[in-house]
Amino acid sequence: MKWSEICIHTTHEAVEPISNILHEAGASGVVIEDPLDLIKERENVYGEIYQLDPNDYPDEGVIIKAYLPINSFLGETVEGIKETINNLLLYDIDLGRNKITISEVNEEEWATAWKKYYHPVKISEKFTIVPTWEEYTPVHTDELIIEMDPGMAFGTGTHPTTVLCIQALERYVKEGDSVVDVGTGTGILSIASAMLRAKQVEGYDLDPVAVESARLNSKLNKVSDHIEIKQNNLLDGVEGEKDIIVANILAEVILRFTDQAYSLLKDGGYFITSGIIQQKKQEVKDALVKEGFTIVEVLSMEDWVSIIAKK
């Protein structure tokens, strides 16, 4: 079978939304070539686990590669991808070069070549993300391993916004807590919460592909008994008091449900938000304070921030 490789040269800011656009268009896996992977600060903090080849990465910006089967609908699909990516400009997302190229690859090449980009990555004091095909031996007895299959949907869990959320969850989730994960995607934040011994974890996503992916990943990591994944729009219809609400989505979306988050949280509960670019940080902070939250902490990595607010 022949595959079409779509390469998009863009910015760090646009990686997450463009990756989601590609998955929603039916891409069988997404590869992110980011030169910052060669020098990321977290590698200095948590230790180098693998070696990367600089020749695989662009000099500037980020290259996103996605793979679509070659069929009669390919042209229409590609045009739809281009249009949806350009619509990100309406959300003030910098697309950079936004250069898109298309080439053809054989199934044999695709089936193995993309795996070279994915290796175990330690992203916090406790958590290490490990691709399903990698053999990995924990370095510490209290190390928590999350297995992910990048070919399923929505990336590997090593994007800065996800890393920040997991680091925040590690700090604030207590044994027995109730956690709601808004826009769960792969389910990685729900999985991390369950591994941190949260008693009740709910993950919601509007995309049925994400819901299925999250359910599969929770089973893969043997925490499905502690997580309920449902298709849902943000916090609509969610009931009961929660200890923690976590949301790794665009700032514009977060601003739409700060009132619901405040209402659902117990007194003293935490609202952990990420997916926020530096330029939107103050706007989100102001909205949270206006709603009644107290800003406890702001974490940052590259161009992204995570804001932890307390009710």
Curated annotation (Swiss-Prot):
Residue sites binding S-adenosyl-L-methionine per the record: T162, G183, D205, N248
Protein name as catalogued: Ribosomal protein L11 methyltransferase
InterPro entries per record: Ribosomal_L11_MeTrfase_PrmA, Ribosomal_PrmA_MeTrfase, SAM-dependent_MTases_sf
UniProt-listed SUPFAM superfamilies: S-adenosyl-L-methionine-dependent methyltransferases (SSF53335)
GO MF assignments: protein-lysine N-methyltransferase activity
Predominant localisation class: cytoplasm
NCBIfam families in alphabetical order: prmA (TIGR00406)
Domain of life: Bacteria
Pfam families, sorted: PrmA (PF06325)
GO CC term (a single one): cytoplasm
This enzyme's EC code(s): 2.1.1.-
Keywords for this protein: Cytoplasm, Methyltransferase, S-adenosyl-L-methionine, Transferase
GO biological process, one term: methylation
Subcellular location: Cytoplasm
Organism per entry: Bacillus licheniformis (strain ATCC 14580 / DSM 13 / JCM 2505 / CCUG 7422 / NBRC 12200 / NCIMB 9375 / NCTC 10341 / NRRL NRS-1264 / Gibson 46)
Family: Belongs to the methyltransferase superfamily. PrmA family.
Protein purpose: Methylates ribosomal protein L11.
Catalytic function, reaction form: L-lysyl-[protein] + 3 S-adenosyl-L-methionine = N(6),N(6),N(6)-trimethyl-L-lysyl-[protein] + 3 S-adenosyl-L-homocysteine + 3 H(+)
